[in-house]
Amino acid sequence: MNNNNSFNFIDSQYSTPQGAYYDNTGRMGGGGGMGGPTDSFDNELPLLEELGINFDHIRSKTLSVLNPLKKIDSHIMDDTDLGGPILFGLLLGFSLLMSGKIQFGYIYGLGLIGCVSMYIVLNLMSEKGIDIYRVISVLGYCLLPMIFLSFTSLIININGMVGYILIGFAIVWSTYSASKMFVKVLSMIDQRILVAYPVGLLYTGFALITAF
């Protein structure tokens, strides 16, 4: 009699809980309304989204820079995306490194001064205001023409007439794209020239680092 009670006790300890089941992977799931640990994992955001890296946003903003004549959505900078600017900054430094120029310090130093300066200028000029992260995002994405210029310098010598034309084109391209984004986001259409002037000075500095 005691042996039967012992076996019943052991069986109750190791049996499947009421309302539970085992799926085809061998994991136990609950049959009730309470969500188990697997439910919390399923509801978690992907790691890249938690880090603020969204490849769809990077692609759309990159295409906006590549085609500056295309109409820009006023909500393009609603999200604070720094993944693209960091990537483009590293690409610019890598391309300069391939040409024998170790300019990472100059790139990030000029970028820091330029972003802080533009943040101050834009907040003084606009009624809406803008945060520093969106300034970094816009200026970082618009580095793309400078990256093209830097990789072009690996193929041809840009310290000549053709090179000067390419340098001027890259500066105008970057300045046009960045100023267009700023005035669209901040509703400053009438002040575009005033916005483009400091932006152009910043990208001229990047072009000089790239060329010399």
Swiss-Prot record:
> Sorted alphabetically, which Pfam families does this protein's record hold?
Yip1
Which subcellular locations apply to this protein?
Endoplasmic reticulum membrane; Golgi apparatus, cis-Golgi network membrane
How does the protein associate with the membrane?
Multi-pass membrane protein
Family note: Belongs to the YIP1 family.
In its UniProt entry, the species of origin is given as Dictyostelium discoideum (Social amoeba)
A GO CC term assigned to this protein in UniProt: trans-Golgi network
InterPro entries under this entry? Yip1/4-like, Yip1_dom
Segments on the Cytoplasmic face: 1-79, 123-128, 187-191
Side of membrane Lumenal, spans: 101, 150-163
- GO process terms (BP): endoplasmic reticulum to Golgi vesicle-mediated transport; protein transport; vesicle fusion with Golgi apparatus
- Keyword field contains Methyltransferase: no
Spell out the protein name for this chain: Protein YIPF5 homolog
Which keywords does the record carry? Answer: Endoplasmic reticulum, ER-Golgi transport, Golgi apparatus, Membrane, Protein transport, Transmembrane, Transmembrane helix, Transport
This protein's encoding gene? yipf5
Q: Which domain of life is it from?
A: Eukaryota
Location, primary (coarse class): endoplasmic reticulum
Q: Which PANTHER family match?
A: GOLGI MEMBRANE PROTEIN YIP1, PROTEIN YIPF
